[in-house]
């Protein structure tokens, strides 16, 4: 049976941390930010951890 290929689109969007969790960037930050407050923009600039529910499906795509 051949090896599973890594989904490159996902691999470019997430990073795997040392404990195995996946880290991603938040959306709604790239443009049209004038209507957002400074607090919103600051919080959107930080990375976040992918939930455990989604992690199971996404780890299979990164194999």
UniProtKB/Swiss-Prot annotation:
Pfam families reported in the protein's UniProt record: Ribosomal_L35p
HAMAP family noted in UniProt: Ribosomal_bL35 (MF_00514)
PROSITE patterns with a match to the protein in the record: RIBOSOMAL_L35 (PS00936)
Stretches for region Disordered: 24-44
PANTHER family found in the cross-reference section: 54S RIBOSOMAL PROTEIN BL35M, LARGE RIBOSOMAL SUBUNIT PROTEIN BL35M
Gene Ontology terms, MF aspect: structural constituent of ribosome
Full protein name: Large ribosomal subunit protein bL35
InterPro entries for the chain: Ribosomal_bL35, Ribosomal_bL35-like, Ribosomal_bL35_CS, Ribosomal_bL35_sf
UniProt keyword annotations, A-Z: Ribonucleoprotein, Ribosomal protein
Family designation: Belongs to the bacterial ribosomal protein bL35 family.
